[in-house]
Regions:
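Conserved acidic carboxylate
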Residues: 8
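A short, hydrophobic beta-strand element within the central beta-sheet of small alpha/beta folds
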Residues: 56-57, 77-87
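CheY-like receiver
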Residues: 107, 111-134
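A Lys-centered signature of the CheY-like receiver
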Residues: 103
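Acidic, metal-coordinating helix/loop segments flanking the phosphotransfer/catalytic sites
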Residues: 36-53
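Two-component/phosphorelay signaling modules centered on CheY-like receiver
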Residues: 11-35
Length: 134
């Protein structure tokens, strides 16, 4: 059984991501254990006791980068979707992240990431950029 961690500081956003993951998996006859975390300390304590098969890291700025780097060091085989407000796509490539999403993340783009992640499909686009052309 898949063990999926969702690390985000925002409770509402975390709940939305957890719901999307559960719905996506249910449509495919999969029923993973989804575990929400609102801070890095509790997340990494959990990683040390039992590794995750998959993780969504949705933290702002350098906090997200640090979390992904630390997770990769502790759990090299973990499949990762990383959502960030800063363009860390080159770091995501270096850290072997399955799917990198640049904020704002739409439900459609997140589902695309889940396809790559849970069904082993290859990524069409390594990152998603918003339409504001920053």
């Amino acid at each position: 059984m898949h063990r999926i961690a969702v690390l985000t500081e925002q409770e509402t956003r975390g709940a939305q991501m957890e719901e999307q993951i559960a719905r996506f998996c249910k449509e495919r006859g999969r029923f993973p254990r989804i575990e929400p975390y609102r801070n890095q300390e509790s997340f990494f304590c959990a990683v040390l006791t039992a590794s995750f098969s998959h993780a969504v890291i949705a933290l702002p700025g350098v906090a997200g980068l640090n979390a992904v780097e630390h997770l990769r060091a502790l759990c090299p085989a973990c499949r990762i979707i990383w959502c960030s407000d800063l363009d860390f796509s080159l770091h995501a490539f270096r850290l072997r992240v399955d799917y990198f999403l640049l904020e704002p993340v739409t439900e459609e783009v997140f589902r695309r990431g889940l396809l790559v992640w849970l069904e082993g499909r290859t990524s069409i686009a390594p990152c998603s950029f918003d339409s504001n052309n920053h």
